């Protein structure tokens, strides 16, 4: 492929205001969806995260792993049940969830980042009591709702130049209690506790769509609530927007729902005029106005 050096230089030059804007910023990235099962996509994601770290951004990666959990549960003959889009997690299931998230998925992402020249360390919500949970809903079993966040361990890691990679498994208030935490919920809680500049929720859709199916580039919290009430936002997008609104309430400056299958999606969002996906925020000045597609 022939590269245009002038175009490359122009792109780098146009990124300067955003490089300055995000120097030292904390960006929490929820990595999930089909990209997790694609080695090439994971390598590309890892490169983006390493580049963000290299130019002074402090990325914190939180991941899911639903497809891998389903695969192992199937092999073990354990049936999955879902209530309102969340996995019902009994004692046997939570052990499998922890095995997959903390032992398999987490270390794959850590290795992918390290293979790209970064320094990543994998932890779970149990480490240093990062996330302490109570049961989210009696119908869901060991599905946790974070009630205590202890994020100093994350600050210690990124202040040392290390990229934290967090598996959404948490401890409970009682001894020897383990909870499965929805990945988006965990990412939102971590972003709120860190007062992150951005929360990026990578998914398998281009963003939040209007009634005609067009992706909306920007939304305010009140617009999101209206779209949920009208049914325009439905299905799996509801918990994502709920996470976004909760994160904004906790002090996150903006949340972006974007397609993790898009090459360099994180870099496009952070470092270009166009941005990516749907940004949800209260009024906030930009370095300069974005022309969001």
Swiss-Prot record:
CC terms in the record's Gene Ontology section: cytoplasm
Subcellular location: Cytoplasm
Organism superkingdom: Bacteria
Gene3D superfamilies linked to this entry: Acetylglutamate kinase-like
EC number: 2.7.2.8
Keyword Glycoprotein assigned: no
Site feature location: Transition state stabilizer: 30, 240
CDD domains named among the record's database cross-references: AAK_NAGK-C
Binding residues for substrate: 65-66, 87, 180
Catalytic activity: N-acetyl-L-glutamate + ATP = N-acetyl-L-glutamyl 5-phosphate + ADP
GO biological process terms on file: arginine biosynthetic process via ornithine; L-arginine biosynthetic process
GO molecular function, one term: acetylglutamate kinase activity
Keywords attached to this entry: Amino-acid biosynthesis, Arginine biosynthesis, ATP-binding, Cytoplasm, Kinase, Nucleotide-binding, Transferase
Entry keyword DNA-binding: no
Pathway(s) this gene product operates in, as recorded in its UniProt entry: Amino-acid biosynthesis; L-arginine biosynthesis; N(2)-acetyl-L-ornithine from L-glutamate: step 2/4
Principal cellular location given in the protein's record: cytoplasm
Membership in a protein family: Belongs to the acetylglutamate kinase family. ArgB subfamily.
Function, in words: Catalyzes the ATP-dependent phosphorylation of N-acetyl-L-glutamate.
Stated name of the protein: Acetylglutamate kinase
Organism of origin: Cereibacter sphaeroides (strain ATCC 17023 / DSM 158 / JCM 6121 / CCUG 31486 / LMG 2827 / NBRC 12203 / NCIMB 8253 / ATH 2.4.1.) (Rhodobacter sphaeroides)
Gene that produces this protein: argB
């Amino acid at each position: 492929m022939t590269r245009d050096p002038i175009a490359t230089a122009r792109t780098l030059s146009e990124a300067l205001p955003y490089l300055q804007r995000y120097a030292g910023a904390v960006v929490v990235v929820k990595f999930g969806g089909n990209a997790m099962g694609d080695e090439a996509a994971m390598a590309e994601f890892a490169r983006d995260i390493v580049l963000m770290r290299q130019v002074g951004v402090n990325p914190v990666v939180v991941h899911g792993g639903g497809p891998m959990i389903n695969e192992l549960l199937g092999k073990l003959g354990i049936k999955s049940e879902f209530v309102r889009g969340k996995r019902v997690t009994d004692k046997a299931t939570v052990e499998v969830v922890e095995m997959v998230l903390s032992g398999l998925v987490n270390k794959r992402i850590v290795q992918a980042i390290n293979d790209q020249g970064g320094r990543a360390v994998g932890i779970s919500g149990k480490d240093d009591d990062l996330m302490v949970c109570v049961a989210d809903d009696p119908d869901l079993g060991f599905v946790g709702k974070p009630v205590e966040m202890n994020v100093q361990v994350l600050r210690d890691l990124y202040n040392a130049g290390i990229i934290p990679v967090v598996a959404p498994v948490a401890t409970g208030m009682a001894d020897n209690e383990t909870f499965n935490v929805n990945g988006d919920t965990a990412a939102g809680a971590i972003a709120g506790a860190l007062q992150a500049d951005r929360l990026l929720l990578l998914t398998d859709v281009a963003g939040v769509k209007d009634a005609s199916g067009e992706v909306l580039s920007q939304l305010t919290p009140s617009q999101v609530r209206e779209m949920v009430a009208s049914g325009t936002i439905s299905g799996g997008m509801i918990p994502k927007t709920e996470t976004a609104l909760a994160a904004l309430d906790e002090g996150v400056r903006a949340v972006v729902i974007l397609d993790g299958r898009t090459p360099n999606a994180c870099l496009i969002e952070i470092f270009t005029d166009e941005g990516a996906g749907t940004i949800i925020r209260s009024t906030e000045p930009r370095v300069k106005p974005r022309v969001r597609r």
